[in-house]
Amino acid sequence: MSEKTKEKVSLVSLGCPKNLVDAEVMLGYLSQDEYEVTTDETQADIIVVNTCSFIKEAKQESIDTILDLADRKHDARCKLLIVTGCLPQRYQQELAKELPEVDIFIGTGDYPRIAEIIAEKKQTEEQLCYTGDPNFVYNDEVPRLQSSPHYTAYLKIAEGCSNNCSYCVIPSLRGGHRSRPLATLLAEAKALVEGGVKELNLIAQDITAYGRDLEGKPSLELLIKELVKMEKLKWIRLLYAYPDGVTDSLIQLIKEEPKVCKYLDLPIQHISDPVLSNMKRRSGEAEIRTLISKLRREIPDIAIRTSLIVGFPGETTDDFKKLLQFVEQTRFDRLGVFCYSREDGTPAAEMPDQVSERIKRERHKKLMRTQARVSFKHNRTLVDSEEDVLVEGYSEETELLLKGRSSRQAPDVDGLVYITAGNANVGDIVRLKITDSSDYDLIGEIVD
């Protein structure tokens, strides 16, 4: 195929960073197969929507996006609309019936075949659906095409999950936990760093389970120790750490290794033991409190992020009050709150004492208001301190302000630092003095 006749493909990725990596892998396969990648959907011959169906809101966003692009398909040059990921893996038959506008559905196990499936579609008018076993694990030979800014990337160290929490559909959509080989991860990381990446964000459904299923059982700590040897890599961030997998050796590594961000994403989901038990979480209240105390004792400046679920079946008023009080007392640096989503096929969906949507929303609002106060007070304590900040570009509001993130702020989910004085290039890591703060963001000036 000549350069002039290359078909253009655009990919929209929804959901979590793990989905984004899947999207980048698919783009790599397509670019390797002589498709030209474009970010302009109006110029694309083929549009791919990589979907999420983890909770109700994610499913709705995926459906809305598909319908929007299906409408555009009639107005633009798009010839094929492809839906990939968790949504077709879970709802293949329903989607095929309800969305005739979609030409191809591809589940989470068939990403490597995307170019082959497109070629097959060009030989038939029929809608194609491929949703085999979700057991795909990519290696460093897969041509991942990075779509995030050049200075930051996600490194997906494992696929699937074997924790089997009672509310979660991930094992059925992604399969059981499968660690990627250490050599594969190091080769991919090396390529990313040589391409300009300064910040690697390690992700999986549970990063602390890394290596348990591999020969020799290489640990998360070993992976980190190998990554820090890469001279041009400046920050390593740990996301999605299951509480009972956070070992003393991991805590010491975060404490002592300068390249490991003093940051830990630690989803605990709740603090009430009856709720945690019904969720099938392995860590109870005592273990969670002990771990958080240990982290802060060993690493006083660590930023702890967590995720919580409100309105889980059987969550009483007292359970919620306990959670609210816990958030006030614990003072998490970052916090995400989700209303429980009743997902077909999960044990929690069949539990008695389902909580009404109204009460879920009320509890969500109360928890977020509490966290806003906690975050505001914490950010005020940072005024006049200094932070290393990764510059990400100009503020959306004005080009008079640069913006960035400190090592205590993860991409996409945490706040930002706005830079009011000093010059820097995108991708630079600069020293900043914090001069002001808001609920979630910081303001500062570059210091010499």
Swiss-Prot record:
Its main location: cytoplasm. Its cofactor is [4Fe-4S] cluster. Residues 380-448 form the TRAM domain. One of its GO terms (biological process) is tRNA modification. [4Fe-4S] cluster 2 binds at C161, C165, C168. Residues 7-123 form the MTTase N-terminal domain. It catalyses: L-aspartate(89)-[ribosomal protein uS12]-hydrogen + (sulfur carrier)-SH + AH2 + 2 S-adenosyl-L-methionine = 3-methylsulfanyl-L-aspartate(89)-[ribosomal protein uS12]-hydrogen + (sulfur carrier)-H + 5'-deoxyadenosine + L-methionine + A + S-adenosyl-L-homocysteine + 2 H(+). It is found in: Cytoplasm. Its EC number is 2.8.4.4. Binds 2 [4Fe-4S] clusters. One cluster is coordinated with 3 cysteines and an exchangeable S-adenosyl-L-methionine. HAMAP family: MTTase_RimO. This is Ribosomal protein uS12 methylthiotransferase RimO.
